[in-house]
Amino acid sequence: MAELPKDYLSYVESGESDFGFTEGEPGYFQLWALEEREALHRDYKVDEFAPGFIGFGSNGGGELLAFDSSGAVFMIPFIGDGVNDAKKIANAWSEVVSRITDE
């Protein structure tokens, strides 16, 4: 399985919140625990419906949060046409972090 981007790993390992709200997309995020990520990636069949992406959480509204090979962040509906419905929401995890709000 491909590696998670360094900025994402730094965020998670620093003890920052594993859920929160953002201005703009994703609006809300819930990150998968690192020790559960590979199992959840398999359980959600990410390799089957979104090949080339690394699942790492959801927006709480039926969409997977995933990285592509460049580290860009995408939202992909759990029900739909997989990669054809993938929507790029940030060039990197740090861009999502910059949008985190208190509400």
Cite the ranges covered by each PLM segment.
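Compact, glycine/acidic-enriched structural inserts
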Residues: G82-E103
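Short acidic-glycine loop/turn motifs at beta-strand connectors
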Residues: D68-G71
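Catalytic Cys-His active-site segments of thiol-dependent hydrolases/isopeptidases
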Residues: M75-G80
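A surface-exposed partner-binding patch
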Residues: M1-L65, T101-E103
